[in-house]
């Protein structure tokens, strides 16, 4: 248990930040899921549109430090490749 006022404050701050980060991760995952569902359905235009909306959301999560920038780069690259493959198929 925290003994000092500053330690109690850090606990409160950490909890607020954790809740914010959980919300950001959930939002990002939702956008990714929309792209993946469009890809599975084979809908080229919906997949491209969903990717266009998901990309800034994913980059925002990386910018806020919720997830590592290289991880987001990798996820975006793979998702983009799948959308492009769908467009050419």
Swiss-Prot record:
Residues 1-22 are annotated as: Disordered. Signal peptide: none annotated. GO terms for cellular component: small ribosomal subunit. Keywords: Ribonucleoprotein, Ribosomal protein, RNA-binding, rRNA-binding. Residues 12-22 have a biased composition (Basic and acidic residues). It comes from the Bacteria. One of its GO terms (molecular function) is small ribosomal subunit rRNA binding. GO terms for biological process: translation. Transmembrane segments: none annotated. InterPro entries: Ribosomal_bS20, Ribosomal_bS20_sf. The keyword Ribonucleoprotein applies. Belongs to the bacterial ribosomal protein bS20 family. HAMAP family: Ribosomal_bS20. Binds directly to 16S ribosomal RNA. PANTHER family: 30S RIBOSOMAL PROTEIN S20 (PTHR33398), SMALL RIBOSOMAL SUBUNIT PROTEIN BS20C (PTHR33398:SF1). This is Small ribosomal subunit protein bS20. It comes from Gluconobacter oxydans (strain 621H).
